[in-house]
Amino acid sequence: MKNRYIQQFEDTQLKDKTMPAFKAGDTLRLGITIKEGEKTRTQYFEGVCIAIRGNGVDKTFCVRKIGANNIGVEKIFPFYSESLASVEVLRVGRVRRAKLYYLRDRRGKAARIKEVRH
């Protein structure tokens, strides 16, 4: 259990942060702010959210994409990170698990996730 003063401070930090609602299985496009010397630029990372863990300020999510030469790339982002410029949900996936770590072993069509039909 957290100290109530710490909890109040964390709540004030989270008030002005807004994130779209997403869950494991959704395809996301993340805009990541990168600072190189004096310049800043936005680099986009697109992949499937395979896990969300933690709560409050400590909440993180893991995004996986297949890069060049069929190499899987996973990045873990803090939910309320200052370096996240934008988060966009491209597809809503239909999965029955909260953690999709089994996708690490799948290749090609076996790694696909069904899309939610409206």
UniProtKB/Swiss-Prot annotation:
Stored Gene3D superfamilies: 2.30.30.790
GO biological process entries: translation
GO molecular function: structural constituent of ribosome
InterPro entries: Ribosomal_bL19, Ribosomal_bL19_CS, Ribosomal_bL19_sf, Translation_prot_SH3-like_sf
Domain of life of the native organism: Bacteria
Swiss-Prot/TrEMBL keywords: Ribonucleoprotein, Ribosomal protein
Gene Ontology CC terms, in alphabetical order: cytosolic large ribosomal subunit
Record-linked Pfam families: Ribosomal_L19
UniProt xrefs under SUPFAM superfamilies: Translation proteins SH3-like domain
Function comment: This protein is located at the 30S-50S ribosomal subunit interface and may play a role in the structure and function of the aminoacyl-tRNA binding site.
UniProt family annotation: Belongs to the bacterial ribosomal protein bL19 family.
Record protein name field: Large ribosomal subunit protein bL19
